[in-house]
Amino acid sequence: MYATQPYLELRERLSQIWINRYTLLLMLCMVKILLFTSSLRFSLNNSKVHVLEECSNIEHYYNILRNGTPHYMGKMGNYLVAHALEATVESLLALLTSLATVVEVVAHFMIELWLGTYACLLFSAAHGAVEVATNVTEKVIGVANKTLIAAANELDNGLDGLSKVLNKIIETGTKVSHLFKDDDEEHASPEGQFKKINLTIASLRTVKIPESVNDKLRSLAEKTPDFEDVKNKTKGLVSIPFQTLKNEINGINATSMLKNRKLMSVPPIDMGDAADGVCSANRDGIESVYRNLNSALIYSLVATAVSLAIVALLCLIPAAWHEYRQWERLSALRDHERTVDCKDPFADTHSSASASTASSTRCDVIQNYQGVFHRAPTLIGEWVARHTAHTQEGALRIQWLLAYVLSPRALVPLALGLAGVLVCGCQFLIIHALRIQLASTSTRDSLQRLETDTAGLVAHDLSRWADSTNAYINGTEASVNAGLLGWVTTATTALNTTVAALLADIDSTVDRAFADTPLHRPMVTVVSCVIGNKLRAIEAGLTWTHDHVRIALPRIHTARLRDAVAEPDLPTHPAYTAVLQSLSDRLRHSVDRVLHQCCAAVRIELYVSLALLGLWILQTPLGLAMLLFKSHCRRRNLRRRVP
């Protein structure tokens, strides 16, 4: 009954039903739920610690939201109000300057309309008379000089022959006189008299009316007073008070006219301690919430674990029944094989030797089944027994022990344990790689940039807001100028075109009527005095109106707005400085805490895998204990049989 076989019998099989696949699956589910619960508790504890530790920061940001928003809105509003008032004063000063310019131009126009017209006509008449006289005198002098020179030339040519005859007579008389007179009487000779008459006739060729008369007339024409001189002098006298007024207006500083911006109230930022804030005042309530969550988590874990344990115990019943049915079938097969009489047709049926030989060569069917369907454990057991056992009984014990340790049920925790150890090793490698990356230079640089980019992001957002607001102001200004003042541009452009065409027509008409005549310039002057100057003044006024009549709305300057909102003299709060300085440390600590949590979870998984390996290793002492128990029972039975 207690003989050792190289395979497992029913009791030995039933000793391993607790490591069936269903029980192991439920045990793994329990471990998974335990890991999940542990992770959840760790997360809740981290959340609790984080919330309680960051109460001061929460209160700080809450104070910024509660008190900082009115503060910065007040500063921005004060800047916008001051900027709007400054722009209003500048617009008013520009309007006063424009009004002074308009009044000055109107005064110039009235002077030119009433006084300038008569003065222009008077001086134009004088200038025209002088110019006509100058032109006539030039022509008369030219004709007279030309005629006198021609007559002198003809007279000189007629007397040329007489001069030659007289010269010969004079030469003859000179020679005769030298014979009868001495040298002292030479000057009273007829020769000298004839020479003087000849000289007076020759000088007629150079007689002409002097051109200095034309020069004097031209000088008189150039010295004739001009309308432009009088007009410019009059405008200069009239412009003096207006220019003084405009200089005084331009010298006014719009900013200095405004009151000090510090007089406008700005709500202060409460940078005090946050001990009496919302978070700190409800610290007990926060802890109570986390205690309730942990209690609910523990109750859920206990209920789930008990339920799974009960189901795992219930799974032992079908496993035991399956092993029992399997053993019954194997036993029936073995009994059937033993009862079959396999006789040799050539052997002696009455020979006892033949029966003894058949009995000794008969094999165990269960052992054959074990060798066929569990080949690896059988071969390993036979190989180990062949190299270590010295007796048949020892070989059977070794084969049985290896069959027990390497049974299909015992191999399940072995496979799960080895797979778990491999997976845990891979997870530890991944966590180690993440820790190396966390401590790398690139991560530190990224965290430092995260700390220093806050001011840049705020400035960028403020610049984007200013740009969008200025774009809206530009569109509104263009719409107002086009909708309300567009008719001014259209009207001034049309009137300027009409005035320019009228001036061109007047000039062309005067040119056609008086071109190449002495009256051309006087008529041009008269027309300019009566009509042209007025039209040109109107054209200049329309051009000025076209260029200056428009609405210019004030723009928002990003740099000024940033300077107005910023507070360089505000004392830095230690809590705020600590928040900025510890930002990278808190991020690094948070990531390291997550990695630590993952490492703890992987460590638990490794312990579970090692526990599964321990379950498989536990089969060895259990098998040895069962072998010892069977040997003890066999020896006790032998002692009972001995009389």
UniProtKB/Swiss-Prot annotation:
Which keywords describe this protein according to UniProt?
A: Cell membrane, Conjugation, Glycoprotein, Membrane, Transmembrane, Transmembrane helix
- Give me the glycosylation sites of this protein: 135, 145, 198, 232, 253, 474, 496
User: By its UniProt entry, which InterPro entries does this protein fall under?
Assistant: PRM1
What membrane topology is given?
A: Multi-pass membrane protein
List the record's Gene Ontology CC terms alphabetically.
mating projection tip; plasma membrane
Q: Mainly resides where?
A: membrane
Q: Where in the cell is it found?
A: Cell membrane
The chain's Cytoplasmic topological domains, given as residue ranges, are 38-104, 318-410, 630-643
User: Its domain of life?
Assistant: Eukaryota
Side of membrane Extracellular, spans: 1-16, 126-296, 432-608
Keyword check for RNA-binding, yes or no: no
- Transmembrane stretches, start-end: 17-37, 105-125, 297-317, 411-431, 609-629
An example GO biological process term is: plasma membrane fusion involved in cytogamy
Cross-referenced PANTHER family: PLASMA MEMBRANE FUSION PROTEIN PRM1 (PTHR31030:SF1)
Briefly state the protein's biological role: Involved in cell fusion during mating by stabilizing the plasma membrane fusion event.
Q: Which family does it belong to?
A: Belongs to the PRM1 family.
Q: What is this protein called?
A: Plasma membrane fusion protein PRM1
